[in-house]
Amino acid sequence: MDIIIEAIEQAGFSPLPSNEEDAGAFEAEGLRFGWEAKDGEAVFYTSLGVLPQHPSTELCERLLEADCLGIGTGGGHIGLYEPTRTLLYSFRTRVDGADVPRLADMLADFVGRAPAFIRETTEFSAAQSDECVMPFSGAMLWV
């Protein structure tokens, strides 16, 4: 979708080539983010890493606390993609009728929060076990 690409560029991020009109990826803050659009909405996402097989209570509490009503995530959400145990940080918004500057601001806020969540998740995971896996370098989402 053109509005999404325009917003990504206006926010100062680098869209990556895509063969799809309603899905793609971009790079920002040294991370890769993905996006998909459908029915007038878009979801933006990135990996926070892989949830350990036996996560600590502290990690679970921190993720739930951050995700509570979207307050600690700036309206984004943290969820688990179970087949790969990947923690995803995502943000969904309407794009039909949206204006590019507002969408760019929302993306900048979303992207700005991701490194802290990744760092915190990685630190909690590494402190509790040897099975800590860093975030994927590529964006992924179930389709």
Enumerate the language-model features and the residues they cover.
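Charge-rich, low-complexity N-terminal segments
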Residues: 1-34, 71-73, 79-82
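A short acidic-to-branched-hydrophobic micro-motif
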Residues: 35-50
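Hydrophobic residues embedded in beta-strands of well-ordered beta-sheets
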Residues: 24, 42, 85-87
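Generic alpha-helical secondary structure
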Residues: 1, 56-57, 103
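Ampiphathic alpha-helical segments that act as solvent-exposed interaction surfaces
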Residues: 62-63, 71, 93-126
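Short, highly charged C-terminal tails/helix-capping segments
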Residues: 122-143
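A short local loop/turn or secondary-structure capping micro-motif enriched for an aromatic residue
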Residues: 43-44, 52-54, 96-99
